[in-house]
UniProtKB/Swiss-Prot annotation:
Heterotrimer of UreA (gamma), UreB (beta) and UreC (alpha) subunits. Three heterotrimers associate to form the active enzyme. The keyword Transmembrane does not apply. The gene is ureC. This is Urease subunit alpha. One of its GO terms (cellular component) is cytoplasm. The modification N6-carboxylysine is found at K224. It is found in: Cytoplasm. Carboxylation allows a single lysine to coordinate two nickel ions. One of its GO terms (biological process) is urea catabolic process.
Amino acid sequence: MTRLTREHYAKLYGPTTGDRIRLADTDLIIEITEDRCGGPGLAGEEAVFGGGKVLRESMGQSRLTRAGGAPDTVITGAIIIDHWGIIKADIGIRDGRIVGIGKAGNPDIMDGVDPALIVGPSTEIIAGNNRIVTAGGIDCHVHFICPQILPEALSGGITTMIGGGTGPAEGSKATTVTPGAWHLGRMLQALDGWPMNILMLGKGNTVNPDAMWEQLRGGAAGFKLHEDWGTTPAVIDACLRVADEADVQVALHSDTLNETGFVEGTLAAIGGRAIHAYHTEGAGGGHAPDIITVASHPNVMPSSTNPTRPHTVNTLDEHLDMLMVCHHLNAAVPEDLAFAESRIRPSTIAAEDLLHDIGAISMIGSDSQAMGRIGEVVMRTWQTAHVMKKRRGALPGDPSGPNGNDNNRVRRYVAKYTICPAITHGIDHEIGSVEVGKLADLVLWEPAFFGVRPHAVIKGGGIVWAAMGDANASIPTPQPVFPRPMFSAMHAVAAGLAVHFVSPTAIEDDLAARLALRRRLVPTRDVRNRGKADLPLNDAMPDIRVDPDTFTVRIDGEVWEEHPAAELPMAQRYFLF
C-alpha cells in the first residue's frame, strides 16, 4: 500500500490531525485535533477541486440538484479555529447559512459524506485547504464617525459592528451613541447596502423612559451610557429598567471624575443586573483608578479596546493626545488636562494584559477613531496573546515544550471578538461562531497572514472582500495585491447578505416598512438573563484590587508588574507604516 508522509499529505490536502501550525509570525501554535474531511481513516476520500482532481462530474460531484438539497458553496479542507475547538473540515453554505461542517463529496462513490455537504452541479467551491477559517469578527465598540470605517473593518476581518454615531459630530466622536429615532433611521438607511451586520446603540443617559422607548422603536438594539452625557446612578438605574423590559443590552462608560459617586456606587446602581462594561481597563474612561475591579462581578460582561492592546513602550505616550482630541478637551484648561492624565495609568493598562489572558476581561473592541483603530481589532488581539505567552508561558491545559500547542489560549482569544460579544448583545443565535444554522459570516486566512490580512471575507455566504491582484493581469495574483471589494459587496446584493439587529419592539412597530429598508431586521434575544458565566473561556472572576494612591493592581493578591513590550509580531514584517 502506498503511504504518504505527513509533509507530502499536507502539501496535497493541507495539514491533518496532529499537525501544528504557527499563526503569522507569533509564538502561537495550534494543533488540529480532528479531521472530518480526510487524514487518518479518511485518506483518499478528500474533496479537492481542480484539473484532474476529485470534484468532477460522476466523481466527487454528484447529480444532486439545488432543489434536492445541494449546498450553494463548499469550503474544502478548512482549518477551523473557534471557541469550541480547532479542527479541519469541509464547510457547506446554503441560503447564506452554514448547513454542514464535516465531509463533502458524492455519497454514491465516497464514504462518510455529510448529507448536507453533497456537492452538486449548483455548488461553488472555495479552496480552504492550507487555510484557516474563523467566524466573522464582531467589533463591539464602534464610533460611526465616517463611512470609510466600513471598508477598513472588512479588510481586518470584521463583519459585525456594534456601536453608535451619526458622523463627525462631537457627540459621535466621543460617545458611541446614535441619539433619537431620526438619527437612528438615517443611519440604518445609510448602512442598508453595506455587507456588514449593524447593531446601533441609542442614548441611555436620561431618566425619562419614554425617551428610551422611542429610540427602541426607531431602531436602537441597546443603549450606551457615557459619562460625557452624564452617567449618574439615577440614569444607570432608569436605563437598566427599560433594558430589562425591552430585552436589550446596556453598554456602560462610567464616571472618570467620580463626580456622582465611585465604582461602588455604580455597582450599587446596577444592582446585579446584566451590563456590558466598556473600557474596563480605565484608559478609555470610567471610574479612576479602579473601574477595572468590575471584572470581578458575575453580572458584568467586561470589554476593553485595542489602543491599549497590548501594553507596549509606546502606549502611554500615544494616549494623552488621543484622549484630548476624542473628548473635546482643552489643553489650556488645567482641569481638562488633569482629567486626561487621570485615565492613563500604566499599572492598570499592564493588568489589562493579564486579565485578558486569564479570561477575566472577556471582549476586545476597537473604539474606532475615538482612540482605537477599527482595522486592528483582530491583529491586536493576537498580539496580546503572543505577548502573554512570552511572559507567562503555556496556559493550563496547553502542553508546553517543543511539541506543545496553544489551543486553549487561541480558543480563548478568538472568543473575545466572536462569540462573547454575540452572547453579550443577544445576537449569538445568528452570528459569533462557525456552527450549523448560523449566518455564513466567515473569514479565510493564509496561516502566514493570520490576523493581519484576510485572504477572503465571506458575508452571508457571498465573498464580499478579498485579497486581489491587478484586475488587468492575466491571472488574479499579480502585484499589487490589495484587499478589494468583490461582487457580493455591491449594494443591491449586500443588503440581502447582512442584517440590522434591532430590539423586539422595533419589529413589532414595523420599522423595516417605515424606513423602507431592504435588509432583514433581526431582534435581539435572551439578553437580560445572561452573565459572565455565559461567556465561553472568558468567565474568570478574580479578586481585583487597586491601591488608590499608587495605582498598584493586585489580582488574587498578587501584584502584576509592568513590563511593556518593546517588540511585537504582526507589525513591521507586514506593514510599511
